């Protein structure tokens, strides 16, 4: 007895999807939750109790996936969907409203009423039937999501270096000499040609200041000294009144 010839999978189902994992698939209209616009998507109900919708029947580009298993409160069909309008040119008989336990709703529209009833039956079975062991379902990582690369740059103010170009002309020696601005700064002298002075033989000075050095302390000391001086002068002005 010759072995049975394997049945080729449905042409719609492509690798890595397996026919055994798909419960029901077909085209449905879906209403967006924000703009309330209708869009036609390919829907696939998988054995793990999830409902995914895609750009086309190849099920390669997944827009999103909704958990159906133990998450459906009720499903309305046709004229029962009073709070939603069908897509332009479609009949109200094909409407489906899936009320989820988490509070959200999924508004769909099938081609015919019979198709809508078939989808309702499949969704209700997926809601109450546990997924069989070994069922192969496409991973959710195949969703179509914007690829955003986040780059984090660490910044430390103590690592910032500010360069100041300083030159002082000495009339006695007839050349430019370097004078350090403050004692807490380190001065490095380098002789080369370049900006900001392009004259020949100009000596440039690069001053590396400590950006963590706070100028608030000298300012506070100056204000304190000024206040003490003012108080002393005030007491001297009123001193003749004591005699």
Curated annotation (Swiss-Prot):
Q: In which tissues is it expressed?
A: Highly expressed in retina and brain. In retina, abundantly expressed in photoreceptors. Isoform 4 is the predominant isoform expressed in mature olfactory receptor neurons and vestibular and cochlear hair cells. Also expressed in cells with possible sensory function, including peripheral retinal ganglion cells, cochlear interdental cells, and neurons of the circumventricular organ (at protein level).
Report the source organism.
Mus musculus (Mouse)
InterPro entries per the UniProt record, alphabetical: PH-like_dom_sf (IPR011993), PH_domain (IPR001849), PLEKHB1/2 (IPR039680)
Q: How does it assemble?
A: Binds transducins. Homodimer. Interacts (via PH domain) with MYO1C. Interacts (via PH domain) with MYO7A.
Annotated ranges, domain PH: 21-128
Keywords in alphabetical order, please. Answer: Cytoplasm, Developmental protein, Membrane
Consequence of gene disruption: Mice appear normal at birth with no obvious behavioral or growth abnormalities nor overt sensory deficits. At 6 months and 1 year of age, mice display normal retinal histology and normal response in electroretinograms.
Highest taxon of source: Eukaryota
Instruction: Please provide, alphabetically and separated by semicolons, the GO molecular function terms listed in this UniProt record.
Output: protein homodimerization activity
Q: Where in the cell is it found?
A: Membrane; Cytoplasm
Q: What Gene Ontology cellular-component terms does the record carry?
A: cytoplasm; membrane; photoreceptor outer segment
**UniProt-recorded name of the protein:** Pleckstrin homology domain-containing family B member 1
